UniProtKB/Swiss-Prot annotation:
It comes from Saccharomyces cerevisiae (strain ATCC 204508 / S288c) (Baker's yeast). PANTHER family: MANNAN POLYMERASE COMPLEXES SUBUNIT MNN9 (PTHR43083:SF6), MANNAN POLYMERASE II (PTHR43083). It is found in: Endoplasmic reticulum membrane; Golgi apparatus membrane. The chain crosses the membrane at residues 18-33. The M-Pol I and M-Pol II complexes possess alpha-1,6-mannosyltransferase activity and are probably involved in the elongation of the mannan backbone of N-linked glycans on cell wall and periplasmic proteins. May also provide alpha-1,2-mannosyltransferase activity to the M-Pol I complex. Belongs to the ANP1/MMN9/VAN1 family. This is Mannan polymerase complexes subunit MNN9. One of its GO terms (biological process) is protein N-linked glycosylation. Pathway: Protein modification; protein glycosylation.
């Protein structure tokens, strides 16, 4: 059959005369005017259903790299395009969300009541032992959010790379193994990792170092705390061993602020056997000597605990550990460290933060404890409940 004959029959068929214009209009609409979704996509799905990795994993990264840069929001409606795979802007449904924080509670039965906990970690070095310990916590992961902040330095870049790899393995696993949400920040303020291990413990750099750390903690806290957060657990990146029931054990006390006792495992060369020793001396009770020293200081001076140059004679929780004692025994405190400290979210919401300036001659976590007490919150510690700090290698 010749082409001319086929063309003649098509022109004479009334259905063809109707179908071709309709098809042309439909194609023009799809290409130029269709707004909701494209007909093309991955795995047979529409492009509007396509998600970036951070959306598939329910993992939220702040835009520290182009790879994970979040789309900018615009109220202008974007026209669809046949080959456009742009992900729709991520905004709350309806643009406005209402939360009644009066219904948000922090109780002694946190897991039973499905209370959300936010675990926050400033991280200058990624330790696999820290991550492995985090994964062995048996609090429901759908109730756990993680927040990290890394410095903009070479060590911070390395820590970030290792952290991202570890996160991807978990957040692409079975849904039951994924954390509710993960946020990574790159520090905008002064970096907190300028010094090596021995240098960062020197007395003459404490004010600068602790101020930088306070800024990092505040950036991390205020960028991650959400309307569903009931508890905030400050867990240092150097903490590599805790009981699996850490969160349940600490929330059970139902305290506004509660600190675990930070110890360190090491090999005792004299006794030729493994042993433990106290590590964190920032969990303390105030003393008359400490108050007297503070009264004689200038406005910009701070007291730093654990140094012979400033003998405050404060009772340090690290020295109250009793191997035969009850793990749940409580001790009233006036200062806390940030190694493993649980805080009711309402304490932070009420304004207790980490001062990067001398606050009653205290700074960072110890200043936070003072601020919380000024807000009429009580501070406690668990002298017989041990968690372990990694043993430093760069002595």
């Amino acid at each position: 059959m010749s082409l001319s004959l086929v063309s003649y029959r098509l022109r004479k068929n009334p259905w063809v005369n109707i179908f071709l214009p309709v098809l042309a209009i439909f194609l023009i609409y799809i290409i130029f005017f269709q707004r909701d979704q494209s007909l093309l996509g991955l795995n047979g799905q529409s492009i509007s259903q396509h998600k970036w990795a951070h959306e598939k994993e329910n993992t939220f990264y702040f835009p520290f790299t182009k790879k994970y840069k979040m789309p900018k929001y615009s109220y202008k409606k974007k026209s669809g395009w046949l080959f456009n795979d742009h992900v729709e802007d991520i905004i709350p449904e309806g643009h406005i969300a209402h939360y009644d924080l009066n219904k948000l509670h922090s109780t002694s039965e946190a897991a039973v009541n499905k209370e959300h906990i936010l675990i926050l970690t400033p991280m200058q070095t990624f330790h696999q032992q820290y991550w492995d310990n985090l994964l062995q916590l048996n609090y429901p992961r759908e109730l756990i959010e993680l927040g990290f902040i890394t410095p903009r330095t070479a060590t911070g870049d390395l820590a970030l790379k290792k952290l991202e790899n570890a996160i991807k393995k978990v957040q692409t696993d079975k849904k039951t193994q994924r954390f509710s949400k993960i946020t990574i920040l790159r520090q905008n303020s002064q970096s907190f990792d300028k010094l090596m291990e021995k240098e960062r413990h020197a007395l003459d750099v404490q004010k600068e170092r602790r101020a930088a750390m306070a800024l990092a903690r505040n950036e991390l806290l205020f960028s991650t705390i959400g309307p569903h957060t009931s508890w905030v657990l400050w867990l240092d990146a150097d903490i590599i061993e805790t009981p699996p029931s850490l969160i349940q054990d600490m929330t059970k006390h139902n305290k506004a602020i509660l600190a675990a006792n930070i110890y360190q495992r090491f090999y005792d060369e004299e006794k030729k056997q493994p042993s433990i020793r106290p590590y964190d001396f920032n969990n303390w009770q105030e003393s008359d000597t400490g108050l007297e020293i503070a009264s004689q200081m200038g406005d910009d001076e701070i007291i730093v605990e654990g140094y012979a140059e400033i003998a405050t004679y404060r009772p340090l929780m690290a020295h109250f550990y009793d191997a035969n004692g009850v793990p749940g025994e409580e001790m009233a405190l006036d200062g806390v460290g940030g190694g493993c400290t649980l805080v009711k979210a309402e304490v932070h919401r009420d304004g207790a933060m980490f001062p990067n300036f001398p606050f009653y001659h205290l700074i960072e976590t110890e200043g936070f404890a003072k601020m919380a007490k000024r807000l009429n919150y009580d501070v406690f510690g668990l002298p017989n409940y041990l968690v372990y700090h990694i043993e430093e290698e760069n002595h």
